[in-house]
């Protein structure tokens, strides 16, 4: 089973396309929707939904995947639920770069203080990070600097922030899932 978390643009047709691409490596892909506007509520909702999906599945190696803001959540929710994560162009600082787009960006700071201390050290090796060199929203060199001590980084030379086409990374994802 692969659990897919969309980014800030939850209505993007690219989400459906990514789900279809993910089905090439696992026919059981679950799309979990969340508001993107209310971080504390989103976290509670995502933990509950992802935990429920894991409990209902007979897959012993489920995977959670997200793009942008979905990558932020996939890393944290995957860690908290004990499953591997694949994150594409993750938004590591939504409290800063979501200001003006959501009602309470400061909630991300509060979420960060409630997370397990040094969770990336504890999560080392359980997350695969794919970063685009053409990300027009985030500086992915900063993302790589923050994550490369803990996770394998794959650089993509063609995609932009939304990562419409993930097919070139499916085999790496499949190998990582196993």
UniProtKB/Swiss-Prot annotation:
Source organism: Photobacterium profundum (strain SS9)
Family: Belongs to the UPF0227 family.
Pfam family, one: UPF0227
Protein name: UPF0227 protein PBPRA2397
Xref: NCBIfam families: PRK04940.1 (NF003431)
InterPro entries on file: AB_hydrolase_fold, UPF0227, UPF0227/Esterase_YqiA
Gene3D superfamilies associated with the record: alpha/beta hydrolase
